Regions:
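Non-transmembrane, aqueous-exposed alpha-helical and coiled segments at domain scale
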Residues: 1-6, 20-23, 56, 60, ...
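A short helix->loop->beta-strand "cap" motif at the edges of active sites that frequently abuts
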Residues: 27, 102-106, 170
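Electropositive, gly/pro-rich neighborhoods at or near active sites that engage anionic ligands
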Residues: 28, 34-53, 192-199
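Short internal beta-strands
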Residues: 30-36, 105-112, 141-148
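Active-site gating loop/helix substructures
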Residues: 51-79
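Glycine/threonine-rich flexible loop motifs
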Residues: 80-92, 153-157
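Charged helix-capping and loop-helix junction motifs
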Residues: 89-96, 122-127
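C-terminal functional extensions of proteins
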Residues: 121-202
Length: 202
């Protein structure tokens, strides 16, 4: 069993895919979950807790979350809703500070397609620009993006055009990540994350 440690930050279905992949890669996993989105289990949690905004405006990060980030070998952001699953975690001051100082490899997993109402029309470049604008101290060591057949279904454009990563200082890791249900395949994502953790080139 691996003794490596990972932290996954996000919420909703995207975080569930990451959490399904990570046990194949590391021996210890901490999930830092936002409930700011409006769907799935995190949305139900938010409704049950009657939470509509962050109070206080500058919340204090839990020591457990900060400690997990400090001890991590791998930190994974996404996939998931950019503004309601990924960014809320980064805006908590203690989390942002811990991420900036982390010794771990920090990875952003891009979505497979656009999201109506929140990210429609946003390219992968737009996602990375938004991360930089909202979390300027964040250091990304790698961006993981799907390269292969486009997701079927609702006809929304994909967000993972490899051309969006040309010229970026962050390492681009392209792989076929699509499962049979138009989501990220945990086994494929695990292989990519294991390669990043092990320092394998792309």
């Amino acid at each position: 069993m691996s003794t490596s440690r990972a932290v996954a930050l996000g919420g909703g279905h995207g975080l569930a895919r990451t959490l399904a992949a990570l046990p194949q890669v590391v021996g210890h996993i901490t999930a830092v979950v936002t409930v700011a989105d409006d769907g799935g289990s995190s949305g139900r949690l938010r409704r049950d807790l009657d939470v509509v905004r962050l109070e206080p405006a500058d919340p204090i990060a839990t020591p457990e979350a900060v400690g997990a980030i400090e001890q991590a070998d791998l930190i994974v952001l996404g996939p998931g809703s950019l503004y309601t699953s990924v960014l809320p975690n980064l805006l908590v001051p203690g989390i942002g500070t811990a991420l900036a100082a982390a010794r771990a490899s920090v990875v952003f997993v891009a979505n497979l397609r656009e999201q109506p109402g929140e990210k429609q029309g946003m390219s992968l470049t737009d996602h990375l620009d938004a991360l930089e604008a909202h979390a300027p101290t964040l250091r990304l060591d790698a961006v993981v993006a799907h390269e292969g057949p486009a997701p079927a279904g609702d006809g929304l454009p994909r967000t993972t055009d490899p051309a969006d990563l040309v010229g970026r200082p962050t390492r681009a890791v392209m792989a076929d990540l699509l499962d049979g249900h138009d989501g990220h395949e945990p086994a494929a994502l695990a292989r990519v994350l294991a390669g990043i953790l092990g320092g394998v080139g792309t």
